């Protein structure tokens, strides 16, 4: 939420769409500018300016990793959450398909002409995933015949853990390449029980990817402690320019690159590395984490005050998501008889 001053410099309209994107932090602009104007060399170059850029890239990677409870070698810098999700879904699913000896298009059994049921790869996602995940899974289905299993959620957008257990029982787990789920839902703000999801997936020998795009900078993320296999983040959600993100990937996790080229980022994301972008990600996330720690209670109180105020003036308004286990700065409502589009147009300036 941001206060937009009017022409006289006095407080004006409120920007209430920070869940979609935030403004770029002044600290981020200040930190990244030297790497756009002065220390702009390619970090792969062996000359001194290149070495200076490489040191800055390494420092940014270490700082960014620490802010997510990860190690520097877990971090693959990308162009944002969509690319991170695509790399995770397509890269892990394809690598696991080969590792499990599954075939992208099942043949027919010679005896009866029926398609063998035990050769088709599977991927499990939740029913409410972001299009970057859902469409990547659909791509696997369209081009390689993957079975896409969608786990339902309850009225508060919590994943059905029993349904996940059932989908991983028995022979099915041997064909399941991966599980992918959100950490926090961008539409309703519900936070999923990630440690329990990891426990269930790993109990069946299946890696799990977590889309943390909406959560990073809003709640603590402990990548290594949670034992997650891969995790996506996007910088524009925590004060960096758009087009910056990262995928955290454990070294144990089978994954294949989506982009081919010079072999940067552990060979998983080729392309000249964006030093200024990496610096921006590190500064933006650390700044957001510090603000979260200092203002968490205040933010929750403001959120709850807004929820109470809306309910007073619109008693029929329905708060979506979990009323307790939700992002600290997220409030989402359904107003019976009013479409979301009509409400937004009416509130827009």
Where do the protein language model's features map onto the residues?
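Pyridoxal 5′-phosphate
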Residues: 1-349
